[in-house]
Amino acid sequence: MASAPSTTASGLAPPPFSSARGARLLPGALLRLPPPPASVGSFRVVGPAAAPPGGRRIASARVRCGAAVRFIGQSEFEAEVLQSDLPVLVDFVADWCGPCRLIAPVVDWAAEEYEGRLKIVKIDHDANPQLIEEYKVYGLPSLILFKDGKEVPGSRREGAITKAKFKEYLEPLLSTSTVA
């Protein structure tokens, strides 16, 4: 015959973690979670999780097939953008910018879709204040198209954008040959 759980004077069972049951709750003994998976969705997460010595935290990268969008800085701007044989779409972004993260998949798609016709680079707003000032970037994300080392008139675009609107924005700019 099984005995019923003990009760207190009020007739109720003691709270599950009270010493009345003879067990004590130990820190760290409550819940042990397995480590996070090595992949998220269809992408494999790679890259450092912590800040490098003396530097800012670097966001994890997503590994994809096709063209990659590179981050460049002030020192690479002239060679990568102004001296490029291809038109270059510069995406000014910041890691704290929500709309920048929203359009990142669209920009990645465009790098693959227009590979060979267009180069796309990203510039970190916080790490490149001279470029931000020189090109008068007031909102994020900001897109500016450069051809033959000059900004294409009417190519500036600020804010999040859908893939369809991105194509509507980019196609006419790639077909024109006018520069400022």
From Swiss-Prot:
Positions of the record's site feature: Deprotonates C-terminal active site Cys: 91
The entry's keywords: Chloroplast, Disulfide bond, Electron transport, Plastid, Redox-active center, Transit peptide, Transport
Site (Contributes to redox potential value): 98-99
PROSITE patterns: THIOREDOXIN_2 (PS51352)
Annotated S-S bridges: 97-100
Thioredoxin domain residues: 65-175
Pfam families referenced in this protein's UniProt entry, alphabetically: Thioredoxin (PF00085)
Transit peptide feature, positions: 1-64
Domain of life, source organism: Eukaryota
Entry function: Thiol-disulfide oxidoreductase that may participate in various redox reactions. Possesses insulin disulfide bonds reducing activity.
PANTHER family membership: GEO12009P1, THIOREDOXIN X, CHLOROPLASTIC
Similarity comment: Belongs to the thioredoxin family.
Record's protein name: Thioredoxin X, chloroplastic
Originating organism: Oryza sativa subsp. japonica
